[in-house]
Amino acid sequence: MIGWSAVSRSLRLTASIASVSLLFAGIGCAPRAGSLSGAVTPARFPVTDIPRGHQRIVFRWEYVDQALAAKGEGIARVASPDSVRLDFYLDGGLGGGYAIVVGDSISTPGGDQVRRYLPPVALLWAVMGRLAVPATPDTVAKVDGDVLRADIGRNPVWRVTFVADHLTRLERIVSGRRLEWVSRTGSDVRYQNERSSRSLTLKITSTDEAPPFDPEIWRR
């Protein structure tokens, strides 16, 4: 999913095919989002800030779309309050790549050809368990037991789900249809783009505190 050199030509071909497909398919391919369930409640969200200091998260990953499948190992180096570098390594030593997220910006060596394969920043932060979508005056929240759901904004709508104060799901909804989403269940994280049938799954194997990272890792 990130700009590893070994598959860059495949990514460009996939992007061309996907752009033509989307021209005809459009938003209609995505499933309807439906309405929120539960009882109306004030829109007060749990705190999801990145833990103070630095973390090193190791994971297995697998990426699949209509023309490409790849898997390997990865490392996320996280620095509070709002910075993460994601490194992806293909199995078999076939290459690798990275993406840097600082606040609401993404940088990757693959440029626009690769960036189109990345989720929006808000969904990338949801992968890390952080809600990066500010509440708006028209936010609607509902509660059902220990599950809190809320719709934030209008077209796109960001639908967030918390279970016992933990962010477990974030969806991007446009014109009433769920275009893409991230879900978190224990050590498993999944990103799905409904229009282009793209998915990225992560299996977190370890999370450890780390000393401050070399400033060079944030150089773009």
Model regions and ranges:
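A short, polar/proline- and glycine-enriched secondary-structure boundary/capping micro-motif
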Residues: G95-G103, L118-V121, L179-V182, L200-K203
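Sec-dependent bacterial lipoprotein signal peptides
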Residues: M1-C29
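Acidic/charged, solvent-exposed loop-and-adjacent secondary-structure segments enriched in E/D, K/R, S/T
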Residues: I106-P137
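Gly/Pro-enriched, hydrophobic low-complexity segments
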Residues: A141-R220
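N-terminal leader/targeting segments and the immediate start of mature chains
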Residues: G28-S80, G111, L118, P211-R220
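Residue-level recognition of conserved beta-strand positions in structured domain cores
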Residues: F88-L90, G110, R172, N193
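Short, surface-exposed beta-strand-loop junctions and turns on beta-sheet-rich folds
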Residues: D91-G95, Q113-R116, N155-W158, G176
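N-terminal beta-strand/beta-hairpin edge segment
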Residues: R60-D65, A70-I106
